[in-house]
Amino acid sequence: MLSALGNPRQAAAQLMNFGLILSTAFMMWKGLSVISDSPSPIVVVLSGSMEPAFQRGDLLLLWNRNLFTETSVGEVVVYNVRDKDIPIVHRVISKFGTGFVIPRQWWLFMGIYNNDSDDTKLYAPGQNYLVREDIIGRSVVGYMPFVGYVTIMLSEHPWMKTVMLGIMGLVVVLQRE
């Protein structure tokens, strides 16, 4: 098995194969981002604030191409808060502005059943509302229950990332063609 490592061409071919796998995954992600018009077309529910609609660990598929409809109260959306890079999945609880008096619409959000207040405590300092540019996914078009637990486990236990990458690298190096 390890004899392939002695052959420089075989080792280079395996490294290129590994690079091809990574670049294909990246291109699929970017393609899905373009199709869904969302920088993050797939998100994982990280907390229980959306139960019973979505459980912790559910994988959500987003669609952001509702160009001619406005985000309405009661709709579940995914948004980013300034200076934080973790998307939040919550329901719109309030909407301000019509586009005439207030030039931009503002929204307030909160989880479905577990929160007793709005999400302003999650916003960046000085940010009281969210605007359309903060919303990265307007429609949840599908979900896969519990599939996102892999992401949660990898973020809660960083050593698992190293083990997983090591196993993937070992499989690529030891595979025969």
Curated annotation (Swiss-Prot):
| InterPro entries cross-referenced by the UniProt entry | LexA/Signal_pep-like_sf, Pept_S26A_signal_pept_1_Ser-AS, Peptidase_S26, Peptidase_S26B
| Bilayer topology term | Single-pass type II membrane protein
- Mind telling me which residue stretches traverse the membrane in this protein? 15-35
Cytoplasmic side of membrane: 1-14
Residues of the active site are S49, H90, D119
Topological domain, Lumenal: which ranges? 36-177
Query: Which CDD domains has this protein been placed in?
Result: S26_SPase_I
User: What is the annotated localization of this protein?
Assistant: Endoplasmic reticulum membrane
Which residues carry attached sugars according to the database record? N115
Assembly and partners are described as:
Component of the signal peptidase complex (SPC) composed of a catalytic subunit SEC11 and three accessory subunits SPC1, SPC2 and SPC3. The complex induces a local thinning of the ER membrane which is used to measure the length of the signal peptide (SP) h-region of protein substrates. This ensures the selectivity of the complex towards h-regions shorter than 18-20 amino acids. SPC associates with the translocon complex.
Q: Domain comment?
A: The C-terminal short (CTS) helix is essential for catalytic activity. It may be accommodated as a transmembrane helix in the thinned membrane environment of the complex, similarly to the signal peptide in the complex substrates.
PANTHER family membership? SIGNAL PEPTIDASE COMPLEX CATALYTIC SUBUNIT SEC11 (PTHR10806:SF6)
Spell out the family assignment given in the record's similarity comment: Belongs to the peptidase S26B family.
Protein name per the record: Signal peptidase complex catalytic subunit SEC11
Which source organism? Answer: Podospora anserina (strain S / ATCC MYA-4624 / DSM 980 / FGSC 10383)
